[in-house]
UniProtKB/Swiss-Prot annotation:
Record-stated family: Belongs to the nanos family.
Encoding gene, per UniProt annotation: nanos1
Renumbered ranges of motif C2HC 2: 186-202
Biological classification of the source: Eukaryota, Metazoa, Chordata, Craniata, Vertebrata
Residues annotated as binding Zn(2+) 2: 186, 189, 197, 202
Naturally occurring in which organism (per UniProt): Danio rerio
GO MF, any single term: translation repressor activity
Protein name in UniProt: Nanos homolog 1
Database matches in InterPro entries: Nanos/Xcar2, Nanos_sf, Znf_nanos-typ
GO cellular component terms, semicolon-separated: cytoplasm; germ plasm; perinuclear region of cytoplasm
Length: 228
């Protein structure tokens, strides 16, 4: 340890080991300078030049004949260089369409959709409205849900499921089809068959005084008729 400390102190006397932030210890500045000399300078107008090349615009220097005769006032008819090719409006539109590739697709999709609406798709499916058919299919389904497939009259009178599940009370046009209700004759209007109904639904029952029904189901002043 004494030997190492002695060498370190003797070397420190001849060289200052203090770290300097601004000193380039690795020589990076020399390396960067060499790379910058060998690298190709970038053109600041590279985007502009590529755009001109895409559009086919000529940015070449003028003809030397024009430069030589421009100051002398000579005629330009004797120029030896070929005249530049004329660019039409259609060519410019076609070249500018490269910059907006989605514009033509949108126009084509709008045109195709309008043509499909006019002439239809597939000939036989012309004017085929899928959503309209789906709505028409939903309406009967909803209507069928509202109409029970059982006889409410028989179920309310305590008939077994085999009986009230075998038929319905009425048809959609209001005709009574329940065999038990068809055999019943209304005591007020004597209606039966297709127009059969109970006293509760009889048109003449509005003129009769309402009977108070007890808990057992027997009306005051009357007897309960047990069908089942």
């Amino acid at each position: 340890m004494d030997f190492l400390n002695h060498n370190y102190l003797s070397a420190r006397a001849s060289y200052d080991y203090t770290f300097n932030f601004w000193n380039d210890y690795l020589g990076l500045s020399t390396l960067v300078t060499k790379n910058s000399k060998h690298s190709v300078p970038q053109n600041p107008n590279s985007i502009t030049e590529s755009l001109k090349a895409t559009l086919g615009l000529d940015d070449s220097p003028p003809c030397p004949c024009v430069m030589g005769e421009g100051d002398s006032g000579g005629h330009l008819d004797s120029c030896c260089c070929p005249p530049p090719a004329s660019i039409s409006i259609l060519d410019l539109k076609e070249r500018f369409s490269i910059l907006s590739p989605f514009q033509n697709q949108n126009q084509g999709s709008l045109l195709s959709s309008s043509q499909e609406r006019e002439i239809g798709i597939g000939g036989g499916f012309a004017g085929f409205d899928l959503f309209g058919v789906e709505r028409k299919m939903r309406k009967p389904a909803a209507r069928n849900k509202q109409e029970p497939k059982i006889c409410v009259f028989c179920r309310n009178n305590g008939a077994p499921e085999e009986v009230y599940g075998s038929h319905v009370l009425k048809t959609p046009d209001g005709r009574v089809v329940c065999p038990i209700l068809r055999a019943y004759t209304c005591p007020l209007c004597s209606a039966n068959g297709d127009n059969a109904h109970t006293i509760k639904y009889c048109p003449l029952s509005k003129d009769q005084p309402a009977q108070r029904v007890l808990k057992g189901g027997r009306a005051v002043g009357g007897k309960r008729v047990k069908i089942f």
